[in-house]
Amino acid sequence: PMNYFSCGRPIRQFFGEEDIFNSRCPELRNLKYKMTAKDLSNRVTSFLMKLPFAIRQVQFNLFDSHDVPRLHNNPAITKDAYKGAVIMLFTLPGCTNMYYGDEAEIDGRITSNEGCRYPMPWDKNIEETSSWNLYSTLAKIKTTSPAFKDGGFKVLWDKDYIFAFARFTQDELWLSVCSSDSENRTIELPIDIFGNNFSCVPECDVFGEKLNAKYKDGKMILEVPAGKSFFIKVE
């Protein structure tokens, strides 16, 4: 089944939307709540902990579909928020579902189901879009890195509105740092728990974003600007 419960719904809510189910209920539609990182963490881990490893790895992860408005069509969702959502979609345990056209920044509207079923814009220079670069980079890593095929998953930070977790094997360590915070934060990620092999903090993340980070006492000390998300390979 489609994994809305621990993927699509919490990701969308964490980055600024109302919960999908609440938005469809008149009695709950106007209840405003900004999801915290702790709530997101509990939602994801409580679900994954109930699943055998083999089942966990094949969860049908998604946040857009033919029945849900496309996240990037919502004018309230910033480019930074969308980037964080896509990073999380690709790096949480499970199989990533890319809904057609998201990588092409397809048009649409959020007021009806028909609004998320627009035709593919084949006449558009899709490979020149920022979303194409985002999706293609993550897809290549997702399908070639052992950490995402058979590796572990561990939450490293879930305070305020920053959620950070690791995907890892004995030889690889990837960090997803996702922020919906309105403030700049300093976080500490205990990367020494993965072994002494991982102590070199890179200057940039996978997408070339400059990192203000250092390694101290077994931890990566990372400055996270408001609303920014990073995908980091530690070596």
Could you tell me what each predicted segment is?
Residues P1-F53, T78-K79, M88, E105-T137, ...:
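Active-site-proximal helices and loops of the catalytic beta/alpha 8
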Residues H66, L89, G101-E103, L138, ...:
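Conserved, mostly hydrophobic/aromatic
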Residues K214-E235:
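C-terminal beta-strand-rich structural cap/linker in extracellular carbohydrate-active enzymes
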